[in-house]
Amino acid sequence: MKVATPEPVNLGSVSRIAYFGPRGTFTEQAARALAPGEELIPVETVRQALTTVREGGADAACVPIENSVEGVVPATLDALSESTALVAVAEAILPIHFSVLTRHGGGEIRTVASHPHALAQVREWLEANLPGAHPVASSSTSAAAVGVLDGEFDAAVCAPVAAEHYDLEVLATEVADVGDAATRFLLVRPPGELPEPTGADRTSVVAAAVNRTGTLAELLTALADRGINLTRLDARPTRSNFGEYRFFIDFEGHVAEPRILDALTALRRHCRNLRFLGSHPRADGIRSTVEAGAGNDDFVEAAVWADAVRKGELA
């Protein structure tokens, strides 16, 4: 599997990209794929990457959003739902396999460090090949490599490109419990002009719904009634009142389409707050599924008919 990105989108004035670093992470690879030739600014956390954009220190941020093995990245969901709004304008999907790096002549391996998502994706490999090593969580895969250099850990599970940045020995490559694992990354920036619709787009929102019976069903019905295919649904606690959640919803289509705009209007009616997180081309190029009677022309025709009725032009 190769890096999947859509056709290049117009990034406007984006020239400085903050990313979840340090150097040698998968996120850096995604940032280079999405914004080749632009200045990359490594930061220590996902939240810091988004804060850098919000405070004007970068024009956009590249952050991981979901992995095919471990699911969503909670830190990204939480940070996108807080503070001032940012919107996704592009995405990339990277194949994920790892290298295990050690110090040259480092001896026995007692500790293996990496980001928790990475450790979870090589758990079986570690049990089979380094059964005596204790897994240790680090802030990122490359931070683990730095820890090995500093003598804090004996080995690090990293993106293969990390071996080009850090003077470490490659103990193993192509390490992965699931051979076709992949991670999706977003390029987000402050609200502004959106990418043009392509027919293979993804729209994302975060909904703070009213806490009552049937609320989630109402949100999903707003999409189903308009023939809109859901691609992801996750819930995260609001961290204010116990039992209250925000719903992160991805679905096919672009806000420029009448059916998608109609759905967003319906979602807004059912929510205490609805944050639009962007419409952008899908990296996998899968075109939207449109059911009979749910095409954009159908919505336009229905609106024209209703307007004629309102004006008394139809009996």
Enumerate the predicted regions with their spans.
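Domain-level signature for soluble enzymes in the chorismate/prephenate branch of the shikimate pathway
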Residues: M1-A315
